[in-house]
Curated annotation (Swiss-Prot):
Positions of substrate binding: Y110
Entry keyword Transmembrane helix: no
Protein's GO biological process: tRNA pseudouridine synthesis
Native organism: Mycoplasma pneumoniae (strain ATCC 29342 / M129 / Subtype 1)
Name of the molecule in the record: tRNA pseudouridine synthase A
GO molecular function: RNA binding; tRNA pseudouridine(38-40) synthase activity
Annotated family: Belongs to the tRNA pseudouridine synthase TruA family.
EC number: 5.4.99.12
PANTHER family: PSEUDOURIDYLATE SYNTHASE, TRNA PSEUDOURIDINE SYNTHASE-LIKE 1
Subunit structure: Homodimer.
Superkingdom per UniProt: Bacteria
Length: 243
């Protein structure tokens, strides 16, 4: 069967994360269920990585092997009708038979949104309602603590052996609504890594955490060493880039 790379957006609020789990409503589970409904046979999809409960995606990717029965435009239309309103398939692109959506990743880009003004109930599931001002200059200066290749074990709840990751760039921006956007570019991220980094940056900003403490978490890495974690609602998988 031909292999395709899919690009998909989703609202993470109603789901128990990306990865299918028995008894839970997940993004992967819903897409596979609807593909099986369309083709009348089980079909597995393989994502570029997992997102946790409540985390959103603008351009998540997965690969899938599909029977050559439906035109792609018709398939996308059927999927989007079945997945409405929380999942939207943007594209299906033919790829090589051995292409793998996870192992071929070169760079992942995540965004994190923080509301620094008054509480906004309309954004409760989409933006961290921090509701206090942030010093952008300090925020930008503190991002340097996380740049480069480091052992991020302290900033994760991951059990995996390889906890070395490279963060090539972190961009700090604020728009006219007071929403601060942190954009992270890396070769991959551990579970909860970005949420722990964001919470650490905010704690550094309000002086409840010292730079020396953050450096110690890198010098003496230990699972879950970082004790702060930003809410899932503000995190978005923005882009997955391949070789």
């Amino acid at each position: 069967m031909p292999r395709y790379l899919a690009i998909v957006a989703y609202n993470g609020a109603p789901f128990r994360g990306w990865a299918k789990q028995p008894g839970y409503h997940t993004v992967q589970g819903q897409i596979e269920q609807n593909l099986a409904l369309i083709y009348q046979t089980p079909i597995n999809i393989y994502g570029s990585g997992r997102t946790d409960k409540g985390v959103h995606a603008i351009n998540q990717t997965f690969h899938v092997d599909l029977p050559d029965k439906l035109p792609l435009k018709q398939l996308i239309a059927k999927l989007n009708q079945l997945n409405y309103p929380d999942i939207f398939v943007k594209a299906l692109v033919p790829v090589a038979p051995r292409f793998h959506a996870r192992f071929a990743v070169k760079t992942k880009v995540y965004e994190y949104l923080i509301n620094t003004r008054a509480f906004n109930p309309a954004q409760y599931h989409t933006v961290w309602q921090y509701n206090h001002p942030l010093d952008l200059a300090q925020l930008e200066a503190d991002t340097t603590l996380f740049l480069g290749r480091k052992d991020f074990w302290s900033f994760s709840t991951a059990s995996q052996k390889d906890t070395q990751r490279t963060i090539s760039k972190i961009i700090v921006q604020q728009d006219h609504t007071g929403t601060v956007k942190l954009t992270f570019f890396g070769n991959g991220f551990l579970r909860n890594q970005i949420r722990m980094m964001v919470a650490s940056l905010v704690a550094l900003n309000n002086r409840t955490l010292m730079r020396e403490t953050v450096q110690q978490l890198f010098d003496q890495p230990q699972k879950g060493g970082c004790k702060v974690k930003a809410p899932a609602c503000g995190l978005y998988l923005k882009t997955v880039l391949y070789e």
